[in-house]
Amino acid sequence: VNEQVIEKMFLLYAESMADMEGEFKNRDEMEASYAAFLKEFIENPKQMVFVETVEKQWVCGLRAVESEPGKWFFEAVETMPGQRNRGYGKKLIRHVTEFLKGIGAKKIDCIIVKSNLSSIKMHSDCGFKETKEPPVNCWGELEEGRILFRLEI
């Protein structure tokens, strides 16, 4: 992971980063923490970052984590504000799903905030189904106010 990749990730996840800024002393600390997280994340072969590009520009991305053999978890699915409602998120989810299927994935879970209707629709359009299971993320943490969705491949 080089500085250019980290800078592109900051741009891609600008909204999420702004939401997290209050958890740090300042923006520099937050960016340093995120850069360290990203480097560690990518070094793990069971964790991947995927991006969709348009004319060599990153327009959306997601992180995928293999929580157990054949079971993957999508997190941080985000499209840049100026690129939304153009189908890029669906395209990315479908590309990543096909890639993971090719390496043996059987199931993909994701957790979506109950009020994020556009994300719920996007995932549903890609075949994800709402479950009645507790919204536990790939790190084993319960995320209140969210819904667990699953795609059986």
Where are the model-predicted features located?
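Acetyl-CoA-dependent GNAT
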Residues: F10-A76, M80-G82, I93, E152
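Conserved catalytic-core motifs of GNAT/GCN5-like acyltransferases
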Residues: I111-I112, S124-R146
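Conserved acetyl-CoA-binding loop-helix of GNAT-fold acetyltransferases
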Residues: T79, N85-E98, K121-D125
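Short amphipathic helical patch at the helix-1/turn junction of helix-turn-helix
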Residues: T79, V113-K114
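Conserved GNAT acetyl-CoA-binding A-motif
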Residues: L100-I111
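A short beta-loop-alpha structural element at the N-terminal edge
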Residues: V1-L11
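Short alpha-helical
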Residues: Q4, P69, L117-S118
